[in-house]
Amino acid sequence: MLFRSWNWVKELGAELVDIPLTEKGLDYRLDLDAVESGYRSGVKVHLLCHPHNPVGTIHSRGELEKIAELAVKYGVTIISDEIHAPLTYPGNEFVPFLSVSQAARECGVTVTSASKAFNLAGLKCAMIITGGEVLKNRINAMPLSVGFRASLFGAVAATAALRDGKSWLEGCLKTLDENRNLLRNLIDAKLPAVGYRIPDFGYLAWLDFAALNLGSDPCATLLERGKVAINSGSMYSPRHSQFGRFNFGTSPEIITEAVDRIARSL
């Protein structure tokens, strides 16, 4: 599964190769055989979404160790997008990719930002982190203009959030935890045919609308009938047009109204 925002890869003159996750119901995992097949075919860079948006899965230490081992074997650089990691719920373990092994440090680059966890996306600041000398030298050789794309306000805000924002983040996670469970209860009561696996992190729910028989694009139908805007699964993969990404990072009242509107529109 890929996010279509990654179409910028084509602007670099590179070929985008989609390596789907394995699916057992709404349980998604890395397909290690498919990953190795992709590496063997000549893939040079692996864009790893960790934890995974939109399906709500956190990759395990064992999975990360294996893809690091494969990446070193086949000469692949892994770019681990860990922007949602601070929003991991208590009881779930997030393991930073670079921490799993020496192989991961040799082949891996982590990209992250305070923007998702602390709601700072408009301030434009991100970080590139690596643990290996070869990749460190490659990053240091990047044009200075790359750094100019961050804003001064973004750098100041990110520093403040990451240094002093622990108590705020804990409160945010408590609210989001209540919201994800509220959504589960509402779906169970009013939309029992909709598939929903409670996410391990974040404020995004991956919903399966296939059983509702709402046509080729259920999210478009729900927008037209119920005036509820949900990201269509087709944004992430043409195979998932019957799915939608629901943002529950809002008030309980709005979540309840959204589910009520969906239920009334059926």
Label every model-predicted segment.
Residues 36-37, 104, 221-230, 236-266:
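PLP-dependent enzyme catalytic core of the Aspartate aminotransferase-like
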Residues 12, 73-74, 104, 226:
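Helix C-cap/helix->beta junction micro-motif
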Residues 159, 176-184, 196-209:
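Conserved glycine-rich beta-strand-loop-beta hairpin in the small C-terminal domain of fold type I
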Residues 21-92:
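Active-site phosphate-binding strand-loop segment of PLP-dependent enzymes
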Residues 101-177, 186, 266:
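Conserved core segment of the aminotransferase class I/II
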